[in-house]
Design a protein with these regions (language model features):
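Conserved glycine-rich cofactor-binding loop
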Residues: 37-38
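The beta1-alpha1 cofactor-binding region of Rossmann-like NAD(H)/NADP(H)-dependent oxidoreductases
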Residues: 62-73, 106
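Conserved mid-core segment of classical short-chain dehydrogenase/reductases
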Residues: 72, 95-110, 153-156
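Catalytic Tyr-X3-Lys loop
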Residues: 102-121, 136, 140, 164
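Active-site helix of classical SDR
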Residues: 124, 160
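Residue(s) in the substrate-gating loop at a strand-loop-helix junction
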Residues: 144
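Active-site-adjacent segment of SDR/Rossmann-fold oxidoreductases
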Residues: 149, 170-180, 224
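C-terminal helical subdomain
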Residues: 184, 202-269
Length: 269
C-alpha cells in the first residue's frame, strides 16, 4: 500500500511506526468526542461505546472548545482518570448565518471561524502530546464539502472548514513519526437540528444515514485506514471496504488533499 502524502521517515528511510492502542481503564481504548450531546457527535459517541470504547463526551456549548484553560483542564482530567487518549473526534462546530458575504455581521462571521478552527486546534494541541507520549493515536476532524469550494452565502463556514483541512494536514505531518494519524471526515448530509435549520437544505428528502458516518469513524479509529491519514473520506460515497481497496491499489501523493497545482514553475515545489 502507498504511504500517505508527505510521510516523514527516520534517518534510515523507514516509515514511522503504527500507533499503539493499549487502552485505558479496564483495557478499553479511550475516545474524546466534542459536540457529543446531539447530532453527529452523539451518533459517533454511541457507536464507539457500542464497540467497546470508553467515550469522554464534550457538550455542544461553544465556550469550552474556544477556551484554552477549559480545554486544557478537561483534557488533563481525562488523562489523569483514564491514563491515555487514543482517539480525538473534533466534531463541535457551528455554521454562520446564510447571508451574502457583503451583508454579513463581522462578529457573527468571526465567531463561526473561531469555533470551527480555534476549537479543533485547542483540542488537538491539548490531546496530541498525550498521544505522542503513549505511542500514538488518531484524530478525526469532522469536515465538509464546504472546504472544497468558496461560498457566497456561508463564507465563514467555508473559510473555517478549509482551514480545518490544513490543521488536519499539519497534525499528520507533526504526528506521523510519533504514531499519530489525522483524517478529514466529510459526513455527507446527516439529518440533524443544524442541517434541518439551514436554508440551503430546505426541502431536502435524501439524507446520509448516520451509520455510514459511524462505520467510517470506527474504521478510522481501528487503524484499518491509516493510509488515509491527511486525506478526506466521505460518508455516503466511501465505505471502509472501498477505502481499503483504494489504498491497496495505491494512493496518489496528493489524492483527496487540498493542493493547488501550479505546475513545473511552482516556487514551493
Amino acid at each position: 500500500m502507498s504511504e500517505p502524502a508527505d510521510v516523514p521517515v527516520d534517518d534510515e528511510g523507514d516509515v514511522a511506526p503504527e500507533p499503539e492502542v493499549e487502552g485505558g481503564r479496564g483495557g478499553h481504548p479511550v475516545a474524546v468526542v466534542t459536540g457529543a450531546s446531539r447530532g453527529i457527535g452523539r451518533y459517533v459517541a454511541l457507536a464507539l461505546e457500542d464497540a467497546g470504547w470508553l467515550v469522554e463526551r464534550g457538550s455542544t456549548a461553544v465556550a469550552p472548545v474556544t477556551d484554552r484553560a477549559a480545554v486544557e483542564a478537561w483534557v488533563a482530567e481525562i488523562v489523569e482518570r483514564q491514563g491515555r487518549i487514543d482517539l480525538l473526534v473534533n466534531n463541535a462546530g457551528v455554521v454562520d448565518l446564510e447571508v451574502d458575504l457583503l451583508e454579513s455581521d463581522p462578529e457573527d462571521w468571526w465567531r463561526c471561524v473561531e469555533v470551527d478552527v480555534l476549537g479543533p486546534y485547542l483540542m488537538t494541541r491539548a490531546v496530541v502530546p498525550h498521544m505522542v507520549a503513549a505511542g500514538g493515536g488518531r484524530v478525526v476532524n469532522v469536515n465538509t464539502g464546504a472546504a472544497q469550494r468558496p461560498s457566497r452565502s456561508m463564507s465563514a463556514y467555508s473559510v473555517a472548514k478549509t482551514a480545518l483541512a490544513r490543521l488536519t494536514g499539519a497534525t499528520h505531518l507533526a504526528g506521523w513519526e510519533h504514531g499519530v494519524r489525522a483524517f478529514d471526515l466529510m459526513p455527507g448530509i446527516v439529518r440533524t437540528d443544524m442541517t434541518e435549520g439551514m436554508e440551503f437544505h430546505a426541502g431536502r428528502t435524501e439524507w446520509t444515514d448516520p451509520s455510514e458516518v459511524t462505520d467510517l469513524v470506527l474504521a478510522l479509529a481501528s487503524g484499518d485506514l491509516d493510509d488515509w491519514s491527511s486525506r478526506f473520506v466521505r460518508a455516503g460515497a466511501d465505505t471502509p471496504a472501498s477505502l481499503a481497496a483504494r489504498a491497496e491499489a495505491g494512493l496518489g501523493a496528493t489524492e483527496r488533499t487540498l493542493v493547488l497545482e501550479l505546475g513545473a514553475d511552482d516556487p514551493l515545489a
